[in-house]
């Protein structure tokens, strides 16, 4: 299984070479993925990757894993689970075109609940019954019926009218990722709980502390160490760092190179 998601981290601008006021804090997305095997109801963790960066940075990391044949697509049934973010699925279709794709079941359910609340009233029995029936139809491979039913709705309000259009378009866009019953019978996960757990353990626990604001470069270095710890490669990473440090001691940088930053890990 390969699952991808983003998590927000508190950051502030990198220090300027010129003196001035300190930049104000903001939030940036930490993009991440987790690769694992399924053994019945147990997850066997293989690796996690989390960094503040672009979608292309994440795609490059996945490409390196693919080229190293760490995901032997000819010997495993690769399945990808994620929410509806376009930056995720665009890269997945380029890198792993034969993998099974799953729209996170709980993310899909949230969209249906939001529409039901606007159309039938929040917390009403009618809203819950409609959501339950729609999810059951998705499990029974009746996604076309769900989409058609949404399009036939007579909006109860302007908000409902807007959500009817959005939800129908959303389900149509991800229609090939909605065969939840077939996927579950095949032993695949249909939720992205694995990456959400990794986001919490690797990112949130360390970066989201009271009063903590991180320079993106420092946050990424910390995330590399956190990933190494949970991937079981922390010892190798530190050994590599010590070797590089020894080389710098034996062969100190020239005057021209002395201003270059040291390797992060």
Predicted regions span which residues?
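Catalytic center-proximal scaffold of phosphoryl-transfer enzymes
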Residues: 1-265
């Amino acid at each position: 299984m390969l699952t991808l998601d983003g998590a927000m981290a508190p950051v502030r601008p990198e220090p300027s070479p010129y003196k001035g006021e300190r930049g104000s804090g903001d939030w940036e997305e930490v993009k991440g993925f987790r690769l694992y095997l399924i053994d019945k109801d147990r997850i066997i963790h293989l690796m996690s990757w989390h960094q503040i960066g672009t979608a292309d940075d994440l795609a490059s990391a996945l490409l390196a894993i693919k080229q190293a044949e760490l995901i032997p697509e000819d010997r495993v049934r690769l399945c990808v689970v994620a929410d509806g973010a376009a930056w995720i699925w665009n890269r997945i279709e380029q890198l792993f075109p034969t993998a099974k794709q799953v729209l996170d079941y709980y993310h899909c359910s949230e969209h249906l609940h939001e529409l039901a609340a606007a159309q039938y009233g929040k917390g009403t029995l009618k809203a819950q019954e409609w959501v339950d029936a729609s999810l059951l139809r998705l499990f029974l491979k009746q996604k076309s019926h769900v989409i058609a039913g949404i399009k036939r709705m007579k909006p109860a309000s302007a908000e409902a009218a807007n959500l009817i259009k959005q939800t129908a378009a959303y389900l149509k866009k991800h229609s090939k990722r909605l065969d939840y019953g077939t996927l579950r019978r095949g032993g695949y996960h249909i939720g992205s709980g694995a990456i959400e757990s990794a986001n919490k353990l690797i990112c949130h626990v360390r970066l989201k502390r009271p009063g903590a604001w991180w320079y993106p470069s420092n946050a990424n270095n910390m995330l590399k160490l956190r990933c190494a710890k949970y991937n079981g490669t922390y010892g190798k990473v530190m050994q590599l760092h010590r070797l590089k440090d020894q080389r710098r001691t034996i062969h100190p940088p020239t005057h021209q190179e002395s201003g270059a930053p040291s390797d992060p890990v």
